[in-house]
A protein has these predicted regions:
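Polyanion-binding surfaces on beta-sheet-dominated domains and ring/shell assemblies
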Residues: 2-276
Length: 276
């Protein structure tokens, strides 16, 4: 029998596929340093001294400010300055499933956080023995309600005519999948490794609130703080636009008020009679 010719099989090496770098996107499609959609309106409650409405992502929050007015109960009044009182409350229909209408411990904690963030911006010493009351009602919650509430409250305080050193803007950063992100949504807030809410006065370059939940390295915490401050600056511009839209005022022309400095006052020259 004739043998069939054998053909040698040569191994062909396929060229390796080039790995394309794909920009990392979050669950809602945003970039790591991108804010959610933001809308702020001032003067939305006719019976309040000042008010504001904010939509930050799917968060929908309304704020009313009453005062300065006489403090009740009177024994809680401070003789040298006003008392800033904040009340944060989530409507039963703001989350799914519905929550109890009774104030929770979280509501009380965020109320205290808001007061701490706003107090450094308000000239409380101008209204001794008075109260300034800030009421927050969350109509729909989507993560980051404390920061959104602070943003609305700052605009409402200005709308009430209360003198302030600067507007307070608030934003949170966090870490998810070992990446730092800006303005956490509800999913990122629950599934992330850490979060850092920050409140900031841009013109005065002062941080009025800094919290952190979770674990970050020192370098990550510094980067997260800088990222949050950049987010606050963007929110600050939206706050200004909301006030300019109502009052037609360009706040670039308004300089932040300085605190009393004795060395800035020049002594008047005494007359000759004063030396006699």
């Amino acid at each position: 029998m004739s043998k069939k010719p054998t053909t040698k099989k040569t191994a062909v090496r396929k060229p390796a596929r080039s790995k394309k770098t794909v920009a990392w996107k979050r669950s809602d499609g945003r970039a790591f340093d991108e804010l959610r959609n933001l809308k702020i309106e001032s003067g939305v409650l006719p019976n309040a001294d000042g008010s504001a409405y904010i939509e930050m992502g799917r968060n929908k929050i309304i704020c009313g400010v009453f005062g300065p007015r006489e403090m009740h109960p009177k024994h809680q009044a401070k003789p040298n300055e006003a008392v800033l009182r904040c009340r944060y409350h989530m409507a039963p229909f703001s989350v799914d499933p519905r929550r109890s209408p009774a104030p929770s411990r979280r509501d009380q904690e965020i109320s205290m956080v808001m007061r701490s963030a706003l107090e450094p911006a308000v000239f409380l010493e101008r209204y001794p023995r008075a109260s300034i009351d800030v009421y927050i009602e969350v109509l729909e919650a989507d993560g980051g309600t404390r920061c959104a509430s602070i943003n609305a409250a700052a605009v409402a305080l200005v709308d009430a005519g209360i003198p302030m050193r600067d507007l307070v803007a608030a934003c949170a950063t966090g870490k998810i999948e070992d990446k730092l992100i800006l303005d956490l949504g509800d999913y990122e807030d629950k599934k992330g490794q850490s979060d850092m809410p920050v409140a900031y006065m841009p013109k005065l370059n002062k941080v009025t609130l800094l919290q952190m939940d979770g674990i970050m390295s020192t370098k990550e915490a510094e980067e997260a703080l800088n990222l949050a401050i950049e987010g606050c600056k963007k929110i600050y511009e939206v706050q200004r636009e909301a006030l300019k839209k109502k009052y037609g005022i360009d706040q670039n022309q308004v300089k932040p008020e300085k605190e009393f400095q004795p060395e800035e006052i020049e002594e008047e020259p005494q007359s000759e009679e004063g030396h006699q």
